[in-house]
Regions:
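Well-ordered, non-membrane alpha-helical segments in soluble/globular domains
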Residues: 8-22, 57, 61-79, 103-117
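Extracytoplasmic/secreted cell-surface and envelope-processing proteins
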Residues: 2-8, 43-48, 99-108, 135-140, ...
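VWA/integrin I-like adhesion module and closely mimicked acidic/polar interface patches used
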Residues: 97-162
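Von Willebrand factor
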Residues: 1-94, 98-99, 125-133
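Sec-exported extracytoplasmic/periplasmic mature domains
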Residues: 23-30, 83-84, 98, 120
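Long, low-hydrophobicity ectodomains and other hydrophilic envelope-associated domains
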Residues: 159, 168-171
């Protein structure tokens, strides 16, 4: 996600504007707004720190790779939280980039099961894609012959806003 925070010459950066707008909008929906970041785990963010999500430093971890929360995207974690707290409205901003192992077998089920349950509970799920400038690395791109590589030439890339909750809060 860090690549969305850095300007790309000649490209419009929408990420910062959208994050600012989402913060204002979310404070008008429901009684209380909670912010979290997620990678391999979900961590709370204080309301006065949310603006840091628009800066590259927010995504940097100075710990060992094993201790860093930015080494994978566990998108099923906020989905499980949304399933557990049925009265809340969840707004998730993600690049929707999943590793190939997350898209097969039981791991795929851990992603789809909470979504199916949310829909069965008559909640709505809205997804909006936003094409924005991108200036960073895209990791774990699968190779045809196996393995992965890092792509560094992207100038634009979409990010996604996933909204889960009552339909009246999503429209």
């Amino acid at each position: 996600m860090q690549g969305y925070t850095k300007d790309q010459p000649g490209q419009k950066n929408l990420y910062r504007d959208v994050i600012d707008d989402l913060q204002q909008i979310s404070e008008n929906v429901g009684n209380k707004t909670f912010y979290h970041k997620f990678g391999s785990k979900v961590e709370p963010i204080k309301e006065n720190e949310i603006a840091k999500a628009t800066k590259p430093g927010f995504y940097i971890c100075n710990e060992s790779q094993a201790k860093c929360n930015n080494q994978e995207t566990r998108l099923e974690l906020p989905f499980k939280a949304a399933k557990a707290n049925k009265d809340a409205t969840y707004v998730i901003v993600t690049d929707l980039f999943l590793s190939s192992k997350q898209l097969v077998g039981s791991t795929l089920g851990s992603l789809t099961k909470p979504l199916k349950s949310i829909l069965k509970d008559e909640k709505s799920i809205g997804i909006v894609g936003v094409m924005s400038s991108f200036n960073g690395n895209i990791y774990d791109i699968p190779k045809k012959d196996g393995g992965t590589f890092k792509y560094t030439e992207a100038k634009k890339r979409p990010f996604y806003i996933i909204i889960i909750g009552d339909q009246k809060n999503i429209n």
